[in-house]
A protein has these predicted regions:
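Zn2+-dependent metallopeptidase catalytic core
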Residues: 4-30
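Generic detection of long, well-ordered alpha-helical segments
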Residues: 1-10, 87, 91
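N-terminal low-structure segments adjacent to metalloprotease catalytic domains
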Residues: 1-3, 47, 59, 66, ...
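Active-site recognition of the HExxH zinc-binding catalytic motif
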Residues: 69-81
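Post-HExxH zinc-binding segment in Zn-dependent metallohydrolases
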Residues: 83-112
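Catalytic zinc-binding patch centered on the HExxH motif and its immediate surroundings
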Residues: 33-55
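Short, surface-exposed acidic
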Residues: 24-33, 107-112
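Short pre-active-site segment immediately N-terminal to the catalytic Zn-binding motif
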Residues: 52-71, 85
């Protein structure tokens, strides 16, 4: 699948509109910076705060489900930042939110 900024922004908007993510009160897509990452960065996706930025490597996502799972992963990092937790770690807070979202979406939590 071809992934561009418009697609990444649309996936983010769709995800934060779901009931499980809507309750987190995250900012709309227009308040987030989105970027396409080169494959040389050796990551699927990233989140950095101040300003909120989500980056995605198009070459590492062949299917929409992969992009959705990566976006959920980065949204969890963002949520941790907004709630005063470490956005860098996959700690207890990260794991609890990941499980809640995975259960709601019908995903294997280890794939998020």
């Amino acid at each position: 699948m071809k992934i561009d900024i418009k697609t990444v922004k649309a996936v983010y908007s769709m995800l934060i509109a779901t009931s499980v993510l809507r309750e987190l009160g995250l900012p709309p897509a227009d308040e987030i910076e989105f970027e396409l990452l080169p494959v040389s960065d050796k990551v699927m996706a990233t989140y950095t705060p101040d300003p909120d930025t989500i980056g995605v490597c198009p070459e590492r996502h062949r299917f929409l489900t992969s992009l959705i799972k990566s976006m959920v992963h980065e949204i969890i990092h963002m949520a941790n930042h907004y709630y005063g937790k470490s956005y860098l770690r996959h700690d207890k807070n990260f794991e609890q939110l990941r499980k809640k979202i995975a259960d709601e979406f019908g995903f294997d939590e280890n794939e998020i």
